[in-house]
């Protein structure tokens, strides 16, 4: 038997990495926000047996993002998950314009190893060579996929994953990459007789706006000002993005609209509005849209499940959980938004 090639952990402070940690976090979210989660699901018309084919979910500290994780991920029932992650440090490794896969056999989970699905090799084998690269280094230092795994494994011990990081690229390049990726996934699904939503699902990772004029490496992300009035205006801007891009039927023009909201017109490497998933989200959505066509599947319809920020709600207390805590401040001068979106 081959020796497993395990990916380690990038963040043991913001996220759970032990069984007792994730179980305590889930219990505390249920105690603090369980009624709220139930009310949201009822208001959004979500039945207990509804299954997401695609979800957008955050990757920030559990203390801050808290209930957004189960809100976005609880209805993911498929055991095989294609996860589109952010490549936060792609510039450091000079990576852009290609999908980034890994070669690990397993990722570390709180209940034991999480296998990388053999679908990865089938998918990669069907992609144009210039469309992807393999970088274990990039995957090892990136936290956006890792953040979701403790919750996903808590809900389903049998999960397998296909992690794909999405670095800098223009919307035109996203369109070039999404179609062959969707085709590769569709062919693999047909070969293995996999149902979308039941056997395989997709997750796109992003935190929403990174806002404020303090603690952002000398940059000022406070477009509307770093006070209560600015906070209210920033929230209105966020809800406009969610409404314009994700609520209702998924369509390419709405996906492109998201990039126009978030990516600078003069340089796709720069922010217009600071969602770190400005590449992972549209690439994931475009792939899903093409997959819908190729599989002759029902049209994907988005539901904005919820939105909050690192300063909006009561934190989940993790201070007693074996070194867990927060990795950044949360003030009017430095805060992050979180969105949960489901596509059925």
Enumerate the predicted regions with their spans:
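Active-site histidine-anchored catalytic micro-motif
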Residues: 1-286, 290, 294-295, 307-315
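Long, Lys/Arg- and hydrophobic-enriched amphipathic alpha-helices
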Residues: 185, 290-292, 297-344
């Amino acid at each position: 038997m081959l020796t497993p090639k395990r990916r380690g952990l990038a963040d043991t402070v913001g996220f759970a990495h032990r069984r007792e940690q994730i179980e305590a976090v889930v219990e505390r979210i249920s105690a603090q926000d369980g009624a709220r989660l139930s009310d949201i699901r009822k208001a959004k018309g979500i039945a207990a047996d509804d299954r997401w084919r695609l979800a957008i979910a955050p990757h920030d500290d559990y203390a801050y993002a808290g209930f957004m994780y189960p809100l976005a991920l609880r209805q993911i029932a498929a055991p095989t998950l294609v996860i589109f992650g952010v490549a936060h440090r792609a510039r450091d490794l000079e990576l852009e314009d290609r999908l980034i896969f890994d070669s690990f056999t397993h990722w570390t989970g709180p209940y034991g190893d999480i296998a990388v699905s053999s679908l990865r090799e089938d998918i990669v084998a069907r992609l144009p060579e210039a469309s992807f690269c393999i970088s274990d280094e990039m995957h090892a230092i990136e936290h956006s996929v890792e953040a979701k795994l403790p919750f996903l494994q808590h809900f389903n011990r049998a999960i397998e994953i296909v992690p794909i990081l999405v670095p800098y690229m223009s919307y035109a390049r996203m369109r070039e990459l999404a179609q062959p990726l969707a085709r590769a996934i569709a062919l693999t699904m047909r070969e293995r007789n996999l149902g979308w939503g039941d056997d395989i699902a997709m997750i796109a990772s992003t935190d929403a706006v990174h806002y404020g004029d303090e603690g952002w490496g000398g940059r000022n992300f406070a477009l509307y000002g770093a006070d209560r009035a600015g906070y209210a205006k920033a929230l209105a801007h966020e809800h406009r993005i969610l409404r314009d891009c994700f609520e209702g039927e998924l369509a390419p023009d709405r996906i492109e609209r998201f990039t126009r909201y978030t990516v600078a017109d003069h340089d796709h490497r720069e922010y217009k509005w600071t969602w770190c998933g400005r590449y992972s989200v549209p690439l994931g959505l475009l792939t899903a849209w093409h997959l819908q066509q190729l599989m002759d599947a029902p049209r994907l319809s988005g539901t904005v499940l919820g939105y909050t920020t690192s300063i909006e709600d009561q934190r989940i207390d993790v201070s007693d959980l074996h070194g867990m805590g927060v990795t950044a401040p949360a003030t009017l001068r430095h805060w992050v938004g979180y969105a949960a979106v489901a596509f059925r």
